[in-house]
């Protein structure tokens, strides 16, 4: 055996040893561990390199700084709400909200998600309407504008928005942008040059410190938030790009869900932005000043909690909220997600609901955004059909909405998909809503989408080719790490 062969054997042995040690020492879900072991076994050496880039868990180093929040009373308010709910003394403004005390308590304890009850909420399901409203609010801003988007393209929509931001920065407003370094990888830094010259500040989230290599590549900031003057906020699924206006030939009409909020829930969005900004920026840190949390009384009646989650979290807060909602369902569960790859706990909760006679309807796209992810999605959908759940394929473009509506009484809207990535790897943010009128609008939007969909029946699903079945099997096997 030659020297090269000896070296190859040694490399293979080292690959297996270090791979096994690394994977098993990191605390992770069993299914993800097995998926990575398959990659490391069948793609030696290169598999370990892939693991180092995509598979490593975040270090124990604190990512977000919670200091300073005592200035605006967040910890005190959270503790007070927890105690009042525990003692059954919380002043719920709506009897319907009181019915969901357990879910509210869960999100308070897990995430410190304060319940606010004075919110005016406007629903957007079309990109043109959402961005027209956002740009109008930015035009009317008087003090500050804070934006965080996973994708910020330098196309027609991106330029339209940027021109307004440049002008507001030149007027002396405090304007800050966070974009995800991976999601916005095609956007050149020069796109922000005039904005920065005018006084605006921009930061990428988790950029690579080494050319072509990013050991935090797998951990992305998937949040989409806009906060204007501390009293108007936007949260939902729309990124910034022409495809979100239906301009993509591949996807066609883009169906998404976004909310405009005026009320105290905006405080939670502002807090989330400040934490993300201070994590992404080594300079120009934001303090919890009164200017970012103006005193006002919202005129709405929508009760809601803003819930964040990420790989730094002890608990998977958004997923836990989903499961709690599903377990509470008595009549209906309407779910939309472009990627439906639930873990065992979430899948089991949905199955039990369907088997218990709850009308479970899941809506997924009719075309792949990511090929492997789509085949895993159709495989899980096929399994869910066996329990009596109904699967609908959106056939009017691309469905990107991430919504869950239960019994026409509670709902969740935000950035988190129903998949492993959103629950374990991405930094996400969702609004949990407890007001029948607003929830009814979300339910109506879902039922309207059904009219633009076709049902995936067991007979139709059985007609899949052997090649499609093979792709589904492989994608399902690797789904914990997709």
From Swiss-Prot:
The lineage of its organism: Bacteria, Bacillati, Bacillota, Bacilli, Bacillales. Belongs to the phospholipase D family. Cardiolipin synthase subfamily. GO terms for cellular component: plasma membrane. It is found in: Cell membrane. Catalyzes the reversible phosphatidyl group transfer from one phosphatidylglycerol molecule to another to form cardiolipin (CL) (diphosphatidylglycerol) and glycerol. GO terms for biological process: cardiolipin biosynthetic process. The active site is at residues 222, 224, 229, 400, 402, 407. Keywords: Cell membrane, Lipid biosynthesis, Lipid metabolism, Membrane, Phospholipid biosynthesis, Phospholipid metabolism, Repeat, Transferase, Transmembrane, Transmembrane helix. Gene3D superfamilies: Endonuclease Chain A (3.30.870.10). NCBIfam families: bac_cardiolipin (TIGR04265). GO terms for molecular function: cardiolipin synthase activity. Disulfide bonds: none annotated. It comes from Listeria monocytogenes serotype 4a (strain HCC23). It catalyses: 2 a 1,2-diacyl-sn-glycero-3-phospho-(1'-sn-glycerol) = a cardiolipin + glycerol. It comes from the Bacteria. This is Cardiolipin synthase. InterPro entries: Cardiolipin_synth_Firmi (IPR030874), Cardiolipin_synthase (IPR022924), CLS_N (IPR027379), PLD-like_dom (IPR025202), PLipase_D/transphosphatidylase (IPR001736).
